[in-house]
Amino acid sequence: MYLYHYFDATTGPFRNLSDLPPEEAKSVLTDIRVKRPNSQPAKRHDKCVEYRRNCERMVRTEFAKKGGLIKRLSPHYLVVEHSPWLSTWYENCVCIKIPVWEFDLRTVSFTYGDSMPTFSPTVDDDKEYRKQVYTYDEILEIIDRYGLPQDWNDDGKYGPERYIEAQVWSNETIDMYLSEYQRSVVGGA
């Protein structure tokens, strides 16, 4: 299994609005709307950072209850396997692909679908994976049961789940790939 991180090449990987103070996050979002109006992040509503932080709190709490190791307040976001839909989100989209075994799996939680709709009070369809956080072993069982959402719902026709989100609650493996990416950008310039 591979985890993919999609991002805009002009800003770089593993940049999370939740890592910023609220006013700075709003400023960055405004800047995205002005400079990259055709990107998916430009379409986010004004309260998206507030909603995202609340969602992260719920995911973090549920993962900790399962014995997950939390080494960051906000996770790094990746998805399980390639998502054709996510690859269209950014004007200059690139991705980093990381084998799941390179992570300490005690620091990785999963939601079947993006965590925002998974934990949204407005999505109430009684599917077993709503409002659920999974460990690696648990998500493998869910994948065995339902498959990968991008294989049966990449267009979102059957609900909000279009991919499996992986939340990485540490920097160790991420820092290694971030350094490698930065070296490749500097070396390629």
What function would you assign to each model-found segment?
Residues 1-2, 8-42, 72-74, 83-189:
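Conserved NAD+-utilizing ADP-ribose enzyme module
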Residues 34-70:
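Short N-terminal edge-element motif at the start of the domain
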